[in-house]
Amino acid sequence: SEYEELSQALGGCYIDFMSGQYTINPLEPKAWSDGTEEMDLTAPDAFKKVTRLSQHIAFLKDFFRAYKDFNDAQIDTIEILLSKLYARFGITDSTDYSTKRPTDFPIMEDFYKLCEEEFYGYDKQRKYLYTEETLQEVCLGIHSMCVGSESKYFNGHTNITDSNFLVFGVKGLMDTNKRLKDAMLFNVLSFMSDKLLTVGNTV
């Protein structure tokens, strides 16, 4: 396309997400605020949380809900499992993200493995906050985006080149099913928000 040629001519990076060449890792915690503004009570939950991790988990709840029609119990289970996943990777509320590289964060495949692990290891004699059935439904719901046919759009570490000029090619995205499109646009939004707040000079 003309935008691809233009971005290459200017030394930029053209990102066609339908190609699967570039990945934005949904599980890499992004910045949702610069920490200086007063809390807006009407803002979405992702903007009202305090730490980058808690903000990002709030975003992920909306992200997963955009991808599949999860009910509240399933989303609450996903939140608990995400907290377990980040703890496993040493990502906490006090993590210094300036020392982290994209490869330091879990990817969707890791999240699916944890969900499967929790499901297959479910002990009916123990008390859990979530049911075995809910775990199974979560595993089924995220399978395609984590390890299945749609995983090429979500599963992997962020690999977008450092560039002052990025062009997001979303034309092909408009032809996909609504839930995949919404989840991918959510993911692009998280990346753009992060760059705007951490790098600046972003249009």
Model-derived regions, located:
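P-loop NTPase motor domains
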Residues: 1-13, 17-203
